[in-house]
Design a protein with these regions (language model features):
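A compositional/biophysical signature of low hydrophobicity enriched in polar/charged and small residues
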Residues: 1-99
Length: 99
């Protein structure tokens, strides 16, 4: 999973809605938010691998008309999701078994 900051240009009469629609229609996008700050959007993208997410950003997201730039942040570890604290000890044990 990755959080992607998207810089975009607004369009006359519709603002950011059209570029947002071009982005949120992709099945890889699980959540999308218009935000205040240095970027216009935060997009949550789910993929099986970092490469899959990177390919989505490079081949589908970045070329969209109206998208000026992106910054991708890969989630390395989760501590709390949807109000639920992730059991770190259990997570660490699973990692040990896999390696």
């Amino acid at each position: 999973m990755a959080l992607i900051e998207v810089n975009a240009s607004p369009e006359r009469d519709c603002g950011y809605d059209k570029v947002a629609e071009k982005i949120y229609r992709y099945p890889e996008v699980s959540n999308m938010y218009l935000i205040s700050g240095r970027s216009e959007f935060i997009v949550i993208v789910k993929g099986r691998t970092m490469r899959e997410v990177a390919d989505f950003v490079g081949q589908k997201l970045a070329p969209i008309e109206g998208v000026k730039g992106t910054a991708t942040y890969f989630v390395l570890k989760q501590y709390k999701v949807e109000g639920v604290i992730i059991d770190q000890q259990e997570d660490d044990q699973e990692r040990l078994l896999v390696t």
